[in-house]
């Protein structure tokens, strides 16, 4: 369980993740140690701009560069697909995640407003405490 992590009931279901990977087959990554997945990142683009989603590393595998390597691999894949800008959303309460992005030199954007319009009310977000 990842603390401060938001999971959507439909988008983040097995079927939702499979659909995302079918649309972006070369940009999402997993980290494997001793035959088990210890980290993962969903990464996709629309041909212009990319987004990173659900970057996570199991707690007992953190501080070993796994998250950083996952991000680097995704950025390399995006560059090879001629993508020049990547966005991500880190929830304010996800202190660990926000520190991670800052440590990698990602820029906090205070010049934009983030909006969303919900098309499916059943696709609810549940946060891990």
Question: What residues fall within each predicted segment?
Answer:
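Conserved GNAT-fold acetyl-CoA-binding loop/helix
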Residues: 1-21
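A short helix-loop-beta-strand connector motif used in the catalytic cores of GNAT acetyltransferases and
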Residues: 18-30, 51
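Conserved beta-strand in the GNAT
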Residues: 30, 36-44, 51-54
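A short, internal acetyl-CoA/4′-phosphopantetheine-binding micro-motif in the GNAT/acyltransferase core
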Residues: 32, 55-62, 90-91
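A conserved beta-turn-beta hairpin within the catalytic core of GNAT-like acetyltransferases
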Residues: 44-53, 62, 109-112
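Conserved acetyl-CoA-binding loop-helix of GNAT-fold acetyltransferases
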Residues: 54-57, 63-76, 99, 103
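Conserved beta-strand-loop-alpha-helix junction that forms the acyl-donor binding cleft
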Residues: 59, 88-97, 116-119
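Conserved GNAT acetyl-CoA-binding A-motif
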Residues: 78-90
């Amino acid at each position: 369980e990842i603390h401060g992590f938001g999971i959507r009931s439909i988008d983040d279901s097995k079927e939702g993740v499979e659909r995302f990977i079918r649309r972006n087959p070369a940009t999402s990554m997993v980290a494997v140690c001793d035959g088990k997945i210890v980290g993962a990142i969903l990464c996709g683009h629309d041909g212009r701009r990319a987004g990173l989603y659900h970057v996570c590393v199991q707690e007992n595998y953190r501080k070993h560069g796994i998250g950083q390597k996952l991000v680097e691999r995704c950025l390399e894949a995006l560059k090879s697909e001629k993508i020049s800008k990547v966005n991500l959303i880190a929830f304010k309460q996800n202190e660990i995640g926000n520190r991670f992005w800052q440590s990698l030199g990602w820029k906090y954007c205070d010049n934009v407003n983030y909006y969303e319009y919900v098309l499916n009310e059943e696709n609810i977000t549940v946060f891990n405490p």
